[in-house]
Amino acid sequence: MSYHDARRRHPHPIQTFRPESEYSSSAPGSGAQTPTGSGASSSQLPGLVSSIWGGLIRRFSAETPSLTHSQSYPADSSHSHFDDHNYNNSNDNNGVDGVYVPPRFHETIQRTASPMQPPPLEPVQLKGFAPDTPASARILTQAIAEEIRIMVPTRLSIVDEWNLVYSLDQDGASLGTLYDKCAKYSGRRVGFVLVVKDAEGGIFGAYLSDFPHPAPKYFGTGECFLWRASVMASLPPPPSADTTNLRGRTSTISSVGTGTDTATNTATNHNSGDDLASCTVLRATTTATPPHNDSADDLFADLTGTVDQTTIRFKAFPYSGVNDYYILCESHFLSVGAGDGKFGLWLDDGLEKGVSSTSQTFGNEQLSDQGEKFSVLGVEVWVIGSGGL
């Protein structure tokens, strides 16, 4: 029987030994006598000792485990250190059985850049021209396409095959025909490049995130942008200039000349504060003189002939964020960019007349050197990412 069970069975405290003097007679007049001799005290002594001893045993037996447990770890500092060491390096510290500790948490991790580099992009391939289409009627060239490629979304910039959807020379001067040929790409994640040539040979256009089609309101996304490629006269470097280690971007854009037997290869980057994206490129080569051709298209063609040094400035005008007037098409016109009653690029339904003004959508300059209004000599629409559809 435990101590607490005994307390419940005997709620009254255990009688203790009292001195002999406390034992007295009963009330006066009574005949009963209370024992007062040494015989009574000696008979109660074993029970008293047993009670005291049992109480001490019960007390120490209840307190000793907690005291021993509380004093065991401080008394042995090496045990505590060993326990902590095992905890920090235990394999059970996986976040479930303990606090997660990475295997190399306290180690210095040395990382080096990967020597692997993404492969270079394959050159753009322009497909879709008819075999009998003359070079003078082919507006977009590979050199200009490479410049446009830099600005298109990444998912399309890795595509190296551009397919001709519409050509004014091959399909006739009709905006309706242009809409019909582009309609088959509805719902596909592709991009379109609109290319225009004016009467002075200037080449410009737009990148369209959606296929051009008649719609009651503006459509498209901020991926759209306007662009232009203009020819600029440039002086050759002086004889004392060292162009051996000249660095910069290079492209293969050149112009036809009357003949020369010297050549210089140079390339420069030009960024104007007013233009969000612009590039100036230059190349000259030396071979036999080809027949002279005044076609403006040959200013951008890659020729195996003698050329003069000519600078081609390519400018792109990305979305400005001012408004969302990306593309607006109706049966009688096609427009890209707008604001304040002006269009960034506008073409009529006969693809004969065009308008280009500064627009809030792209913050562009006039795209044609003819002025705000220009005459159209050629129009092309190219699709990127169609997979040969």
Curated annotation (Swiss-Prot):
PROSITE patterns: TLDC. Keywords: Mitochondrion. Pfam families: TLD. Residues 1-12 have a biased composition (Basic residues). GO terms for biological process: response to oxidative stress. Residues 1-45, 67-90, 238-269 are annotated as: Disordered. Belongs to the OXR1 family. This is Oxidation resistance protein 1. It comes from Neurospora crassa (strain ATCC 24698 / 74-OR23-1A / CBS 708.71 / DSM 1257 / FGSC 987).
